């Protein structure tokens, strides 16, 4: 933290002389604060203080003024320190915050795991014979396209319901208890999947399990963004993508084992379902002891608890730690107060579309996450099935899937390095551009029936997975946590994830029709379709997606308020803590309200 000793001394001076505003004349008490006329002309953000006698009690308004301006100075100091904090310093100062964020994000492993095994089941022989039908022409067993679509719709519908339930639950009990409740229900609903004897039971189980998965999707991102400083936010929000990949890799390994050892046994699909019981209990215990988000606590007016929560995320002890806590709480309060000045109501879903600023932020957040589906990533989730339909053997299809997820994990780690040199928009747009080219090549290879073209299309899909996890996938988790206002962050993320789910449903239906031999049977030629859709997503990103790298939440708020265009976000500099229009008269009964209003208006 920059110049902590100065802040400590400033607070001591304020305590010893509460009637004097730091750095101003001591002879009289200010009765109004206004900008100097020449300063206004010059455009300089300097506060000029006029003094005159006041008939009121000598200390009350001065004390309030000092407190308000000190809080704003503290908020600005915290914001500047956060923006300039190196990664090593952030890890040394906030190691506990990083650890708690990693713990909460680990819940996404279960969603990545289960959604991956569902797609892999369609290529598993025992699952095909148990729940599928035989193709009269080829003699092969296959799950019908209608059931594949139905199962996909069930878990995505469950996620949509779960996301909608997450909003009011967080408002009521907070992030921690909402996650614990979701983990409990996930463990309970897994029994339905384990004891399934029909596709109908699997559909019910998937729909019910989808509800806690929806909760995980929202809260892992919002919790990581609110508990960690700017220097760590990219790494810890994109860790959500790593958890997805860990779950998918785990699923690919289990499914390859099932394909080899349990090809003719019900354990081939029961064992993968049973392994979902491993994580809920230890994760629930860990989350119970985790600190609540200080942003949520401040919004609820529980400032002492917010300070305790922040202390649990910081290393060290003594006055410097307490100053860090005070600065951070003041910054959160100023940010939330500025947002509250825009509306007198508690944040609701309708507020996400209430005015031009929030409509823009909501639109960008929703379309940014929807881009994960329209770029063709849903095809990666059905990779084993895709490889098989492209002409690759069943065993090699499972092997390709394992390699694909390993490449994705390596790519996500590489994105952490790339984030030092490239912005969020740069990585997002680069990923879209590369995938557009590769999908067209895959489509072209699909026009040939040679063995080399089949292996080539499979290899290129692995390349798509690599660059998707280098650019688009991890960056989205960061962007969707930065675009919304803090007051509406949880609700905006819920709307965005539901947008993604709806778009994913449409994309999944299209993919299953494209790959199923009884429907369109496009095989690798489906790459042409996804190349076009990916290119359309790239055009949107160029026009509408701002660059937020290196910007704090307060700066992003100000940039949206000023209506800065997407491509000018990166170069535009703002100072959201400057007081440009302080009240001209603080001699009435509520000087605090007027000064807060003048600060909030900026």
UniProtKB/Swiss-Prot annotation:
Triggers of expression: By maltose and maltotriose. Repressed by glucose.
One example of a Gene Ontology biological process annotation: maltose metabolic process
Extracellular-side positions: 128-142, 200, 256-270, 385-397, 448-459, 514-525
Primary subcellular site in the record, as a coarse category: membrane
Origin: domain of life: Eukaryota
GO MF assignments: carbohydrate:proton symporter activity
InterPro entries: MFS_dom (IPR020846), MFS_sugar_transport-like (IPR005828), MFS_Sugar_Transporters (IPR050360), MFS_trans_sf (IPR036259), Sugar/inositol_transpt (IPR003663), Sugar_transporter_CS (IPR005829)
Record's GO cellular component terms: plasma membrane
Transmembrane segment boundaries: 107-127, 143-163, 179-199, 201-221, 235-255, 271-291, 364-384, 398-418, 427-447, 460-480, 493-513, 526-546
Ranges of Basic and acidic residues composition bias in the record: 582-595
Protein name: Alpha-glucosides permease MPH3
Record key words, sorted: Cell membrane, Maltose metabolism, Membrane, Sugar transport, Transmembrane, Transmembrane helix, Transport
Entry's family note: Belongs to the major facilitator superfamily. Sugar transporter (TC 2.A.1.1) family.
Pfam families: Sugar_tr (PF00083)
Function: High-affinity uptake of maltose and maltotriose. Also transports alpha-methylglucoside, glucose and turanose but not melezitose or trehalose.
Listed NCBIfam families: SP (TIGR00879)
UniProt membrane topology term: Multi-pass membrane protein
Keyword Transmembrane included in the entry's annotation: yes
PROSITE patterns (alphabetical): MFS, SUGAR_TRANSPORT_2
Topology feature Cytoplasmic, residues: 1-106, 164-178, 222-234, 292-363, 419-426, 481-492, 547-602
């Amino acid at each position: 933290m920059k110049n902590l000793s100065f802040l400590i001394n400033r607070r001591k001076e304020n305590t010893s002389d509460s009637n004097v505003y730091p750095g101003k004349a001591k002879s009289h008490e200010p009765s109004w604060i206004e900008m100097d006329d020449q300063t206004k002309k010059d455009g300089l953000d300097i506060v000029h203080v006029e003094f005159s006698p006041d008939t009121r009690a000598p200390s009350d308004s001065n004390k309030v003024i000092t407190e308000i301006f000190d809080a704003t100075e503290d908020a600005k100091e915290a914001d500047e320190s956060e923006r300039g904090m190196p990664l090593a310093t952030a890890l040394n100062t906030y190691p506990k915050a990083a650890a708690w964020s990693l713990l909460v994000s680990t819940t996404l492993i279960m969603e990545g795991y289960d959604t991956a095994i569902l797609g892999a089941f369609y290529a598993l022989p025992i699952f095909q014979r148990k729940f599928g039908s035989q193709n009269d022409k080829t003699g092969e067993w296959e799950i019908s396209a209608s059931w594949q679509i139905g199962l996909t719709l069930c878990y995505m519908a469950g996620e949509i319901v779960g996301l909608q339930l997450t909003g009011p639950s967080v408002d009521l009990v907070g992030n921690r208890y909402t996650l614990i409740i979701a983990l409990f229900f996930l463990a309970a609903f897994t029994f339905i999947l384990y004891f399934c004897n029909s596709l109908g039971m699997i559909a019910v189980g998937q729909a019910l399990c989808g509800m806690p998965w929806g909760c995980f999707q929202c809260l892992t991102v919002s919790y990581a963004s609110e508990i960690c400083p700017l220097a760590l936010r990219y790494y810890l929000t994109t860790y959500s993508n790593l958890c997805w990949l860990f779950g998918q890799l785990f699923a690919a390994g289990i499914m390859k084992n099932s394909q080899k050892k349990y090809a003719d046994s019900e354990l081939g699909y029961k064992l993968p379902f049973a392994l979902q019981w491993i994580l809920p209990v230890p994760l629930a215990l860990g989350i119970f002891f985790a600190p609540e988000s200080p942003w949520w606590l401040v919004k609820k007016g529980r400032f002492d608890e917010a300070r305790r929560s922040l202390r649990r995320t910081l290393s060290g002890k003594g006055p410097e730690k307490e100053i860090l806590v005070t600065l951070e709480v003041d910054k959160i309060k100023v940010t939330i107060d500025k947002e509250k000045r825009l509306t007198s109501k508690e944040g609701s879903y309708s507020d996400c579309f209430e005015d031009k600023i929030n409509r823009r932020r909501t639109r960008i957040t929703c379309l940014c996450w929807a881009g994960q589906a329209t770029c063709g990533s849903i095809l990666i989730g059905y990779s084993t099935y895709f490889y098989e339909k492209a002409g690759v053997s069943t065993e090699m299809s499972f092997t390709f899937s394992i390699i694909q997820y390993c490449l994705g994990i390596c790519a996500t780690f590489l994105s952490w390095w790339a984030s030092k040199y490239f912005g969020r928009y740069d990585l997002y747009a680069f990923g879209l551009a590369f995938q557009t080219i590769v999908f067209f090549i895959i489509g072209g290879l699909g026009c040939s029936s040679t063995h080399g073209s089949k292996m080539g299309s499979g290899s290129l899909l692995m390349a798509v997975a690599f660059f998707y996890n280098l650019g688009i996938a991890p960056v989205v988790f960061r962007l969707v946590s930065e675009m919304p206002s803090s007051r509406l962050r949880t609700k905006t993320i819920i709307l965005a994830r539901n947008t993604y789910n709806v778009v994913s449903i449409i994309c999944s239906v299209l993919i299953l029709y494209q790959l199923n031999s009884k429907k369109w049977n496009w095989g690798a030629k489906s790459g042409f379709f996804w190349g076009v859709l990916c290119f359309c997503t790239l055009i949107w990103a160029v026009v509408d997606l701002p660059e937020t790298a290196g910007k704090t939440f307060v700066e992003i708020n100000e940039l949206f308020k000023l209506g800065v265009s997407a491509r000018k976000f990166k170069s535009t500099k703002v100072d959201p803590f400057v007081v440009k229009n302080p009240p001209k008269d603080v001699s009435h009964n509520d000087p605090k309200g007027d000064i807060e209003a003048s600060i909030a208006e900026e």
